């Protein structure tokens, strides 16, 4: 967050307007303080507030998808917010489903239950056949199998706080994948270009997506076959 954010928040409080202001963040939650000013000391002074914290997977997978994420620091920051939250909608998880993130479905579900917070869920945009990190890049049968395995684990113990994840997964099974959206050679060539682009990005970042995908042999075999 920019310096001006912290100054503005303090100024609103100093002028006595905080009780008239609703504050909402969509944030990586990588920083919760600056120069002694703490976000979760400020927020309770406002009329209402909400933090939707972006997370695409736990641990190593989450750190791969969202470059720069320190998962353990993120978790510490999120729990700091939970300590001052008075309603269930003040601290929520915002999960964007990606292809590598499908390997984290059970872990994200468990995290939501362990923290007792709502897990808002959406799917990565897929505007081009090069979007190989989209779950819709996977063959439809494999995607549905992964989803069904996750639902079998989740549904018996899910609460309303995980319902967004379950609904999104069920909807995802009925969506067109890259082969349906971009017929024939376009889908094949697009995947190859997308894979090459991701490999270049990995090289720059010093990462390797195959290390992540090796968690599921089926997904790794698909990736290798592109």
Task: Describe the function of each predicted region.
Residues 1-4, 13-35, 43-76, 90-99, ...:
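Core AdoMet radical
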Residues 5-10, 35-39, 71-80, 105-108, ...:
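Well-ordered, non-membrane alpha-helical segments in soluble/globular domains
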Residues 79-82, 113:
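Class I S-adenosyl-L-methionine
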Residues 85:
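Betabetaalpha-Me/HNH-type nuclease active-site subdomain
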Residues 99-102, 120-151, 158-172, 183, ...:
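Flexible glycine/acidic-rich beta-alpha junction loops that bind and position SAM and/or redox cofactors
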Residues 99-115:
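Catalytic cores of alpha/beta
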Residues 151-226:
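Radical SAM enzyme core and accessory elements
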């Amino acid at each position: 967050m920019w310096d001006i954010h912290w100054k503005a928040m303090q100024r609103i409080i100093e002028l006595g307007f905080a009780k008239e202001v609703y504050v909402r963040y969509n944030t990586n939650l990588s920083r919760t303080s600056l120069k002694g000013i703490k976000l979760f000391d400020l927020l309770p002074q406002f009329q209402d507030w909400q933090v939707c914290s972006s997370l695409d997977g736990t641990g190593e997978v989450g750190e791969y998808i969202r470059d720069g994420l320190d998962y353990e620091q993120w978790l510490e920051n999120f729990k700091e917010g939970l300590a001052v939250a008075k309603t269930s909608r003040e601290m929520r998880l915002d999960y964007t489903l990606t292809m590598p993130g499908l390997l984290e479905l059970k872990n994200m579900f468990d995290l939501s239950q362990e923290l007792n917070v709502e897990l808002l869920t959406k799917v990565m945009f897929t505007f081009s056949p090069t979007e190989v990190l989209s779950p819709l890049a996977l063959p439809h049968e494999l995607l549905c199998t992964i989803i069904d395995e996750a639902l079998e684990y989740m549904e018996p113990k899910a609460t309303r706080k995980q319902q967004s994840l379950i609904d999104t997964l069920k909807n995802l099974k009925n969506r067109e994948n890259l082969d349906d959206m971009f017929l024939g050679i376009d889908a094949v060539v697009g995947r190859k270009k997308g894979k090459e682009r991701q490999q270049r990005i990995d090289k720059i970042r010093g990462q390797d997506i195959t290390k992540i995908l090796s968690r599921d042999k089926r997904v790794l075999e698909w990736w290798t076959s592109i």
